[in-house]
Amino acid sequence: MIPQKLRLKNFLSYQQLALNFSGLHVACICGANGAGKSSLLEAITWAVWGASRAGSEDDVIHMGAKEAQVDFTFIAGSEVYRVIRTRSRNSSTSLEFQVQSEGKFKSLTERKVRSTQQTIVSHLKMDYETFVNSAYLRQGRAD
C-alpha cells in the first residue's frame, strides 16, 4: 500500500488536514509528543479497516464536532484506490470504496458497510490483523 493523499476532517486531534504523498518515495512524520503523528497512522487504519485505538466508535470524532471523516487514496498492486469513511456522533458509520479507472474513480461500494469492508479486504488481500501484525506497529504496542 503506497499512500497518495490523506484528508482528515474532525478526526482525533485534527479538525482539517490534507496531505499529498504523491511522488514521495519516503515520508518521515516527526513532531513533539502529542502533536498528532500517531493520529495520522490511526486515520489510515480507521479509513481502510474501521479499527482504531479509540475506546468507542464516537471517540474518533474531534471534541465538539458532529462527525469525523477520513478520505484516503493509495496504490495497491497496480490499482489506485480511494476509501472514505465517515462517523456521525451517536449515529452510524458510512464507508465508500472506489477504484480509479480511466482517470476517474468508480464505486466499488456495497449496500452495507460490512460488505464494503469485505470488498476492501478482498482487493487488498490483507485483513486488519495481518496489517497490524506485519506492517504497522501501533503506539504503545512495541513490547
Positions of the model-derived regions?
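Extreme N-terminal "head/tail" segments of very large remodeling/mechanoenzyme assemblies
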Residues: M1-Q118, S122-N133
